[in-house]
C-alpha cells in the first residue's frame, strides 16, 4: 500500500493504524527534506570541476597541484604508476564508497566474492571469444538499424544518445542473455531503467551521508531500482531454467551467452549465486559506458565529416581482404584511431583510479595519503601537449600517425590501439583493475560503426547543442542531441 492509498482510504480517519502510518510518513518526509538541505554539499566540499573548454584543455604545467575536498584527494597523473597496483589503496573500497554497493538495489555491483570475480572472469573469457561473437553482434546491429533507423532514403531525425543506449542494450543482451531476451522489449527497458535509476539513486544518496541506510527506502529512484530487480527476476530465471532443461543430460558445449556460461561455472564450483543481479551488473557496465562512447564518437565523426569517406574506404578495403573477422577489426586502424582520439578528449570522467587508503600511504615524493582518505587520479596527461601535440585539437589520424612513427623507428606500437591502457591514456583505467571488458567493447563499437557508416548518411541537427559538457567529474554529450540520418542508396557490395 502506498502513502497515497493510505490517505485516500475510506478508513483513514477512523482506523488508528493507517492514520499513524500516514502521520509518520509525512513527518519523516519533512525531516528527510530538512536534513537533505542541511547535508547538501557546499562548494568547498564538492569536487573541483576539471577544465573542459577546448581553449583550457591544454595542460602544460609540469607539476599540476594536488587538490583536496572533504576527505578526498585528487592526485595528478604523475602518480599513476604508484597508485595503479598499490594494494594499500583499495579498489573495492573505492567502488563501495562511490557506488554505495551495500544499499539494496545497488548491490548488483558488489555481492560476494563469486559475483565480483565472475563478472571479471566473464569479461575476460568473452574477450577471448571475439572471433565467435562478430557474427551475432553484426546480425543484431543490422536488425536494430533496420527496425529503428529504417530503410528510408529521405532525411529523418533520431535521438542520438537514446538510440545508442537501445542499440548497445540489444547488442550486449545478445551476448549476455542470448537470443531469447535480446529483442525482448521488457528486458531492454529493464536494463535501461536499471542503468538510469542506478545513476540517479547514487547521485541523490550521496547528499545524505550517514542517513543513507534510512533514506534509500524512501527515495523514488531507489524504489524504482529495486522494482527493476524484482521485475527482471522472472525473465532471467525463466530463460535460465529453459537452458538448464534443454541441456540436461547432454554433453556440455561451450556457451556463447554469458548467462549459460556463468551458470556452468557456478555449477562446476558448487557456488550459489544470484543470476539476476549478475546480469543487471553486466548490463549496467556495458550500456552505461559503451553507449556513452558510441554517442561521443558519432558526434565527433559528424563534427569532422571529412573522416567519413576515408573511414568507409578503410572498412570496405579491409573487409574485402579479411572478411568479417577479428583480424579485420584489428586492421581498421583509422577507425581505431578515431575511437581512441574521441576517448582521449572525452573520457567518461576527468578523474579515474578511485581508491581508499586502508593504511596511511607515503608516495615516493613524500606525499602522504592518510588512512581512510579517498584518492583519485586526474587524466590530465591525455590533454597535455607535451605528450600529444596540439592536445586540445581533435585529430582523427593522431594514433595512425603515431603508429607510423613507431614503425619508422622500429618501436612497438602496441600501446596505441583503442583498447590499450597507459599512464598517458587512461580511458579504460590503468593497472590490474583496468576495464576487463574493453576488448569486447572495442569489437562491439567497431562492428556497430561499420554498419552505421556503410549504410547511412548522418549529420548532427544542432552541433552546438551536441557539444561536450561536464557535470562534476563526468564528461558527456547532451542527451537532447539529435541526428539526421538517411539510408544510403549506394551498393556497398559487402555481406554482413
UniProtKB/Swiss-Prot annotation:
Transmembrane segments: 12-34
UniProt cofactor(s): heme
Provenance organism: Aspergillus versicolor
Family matches, as PANTHER family: CYTOCHROME P450, P450, PUTATIVE (EUROFUNG)-RELATED
Recorded GO CC terms: membrane
GO biological process annotation, one example: secondary metabolic process
This enzyme's EC code(s): 1.-.-.-
Membrane topology label: Single-pass membrane protein
Pathway membership, UniProt: Secondary metabolite biosynthesis; terpenoid biosynthesis
Species classification: Eukaryota, Fungi, Dikarya, Ascomycota, Pezizomycotina
Family: Belongs to the cytochrome P450 family.
Database matches in Gene3D superfamilies: Cytochrome P450
Keyword field contains Metal-binding: yes
Task performed by this protein: Cytochrome P450 monooxygenase; part of the cluster A that mediates the biosynthesis of chevalone E and its oxidized derivatives that possess a unique five-membered lactone ring and can synergistically enhance the cytotoxicity of doxorubicin (DOX) in breast cancer cells.
Name used for this protein in its record: Cytochrome P450 monooxygenase cle4
InterPro entries: Cyt_P450, Cyt_P450_CS, Cyt_P450_E_grp-IV, Cyt_P450_sf
Keywords: Heme, Iron, Membrane, Metal-binding, Monooxygenase, Oxidoreductase, Transmembrane, Transmembrane helix
GO MF annotations in UniProt: heme binding; iron ion binding; monooxygenase activity; oxidoreductase activity, acting on paired donors, with incorporation or reduction of molecular oxygen
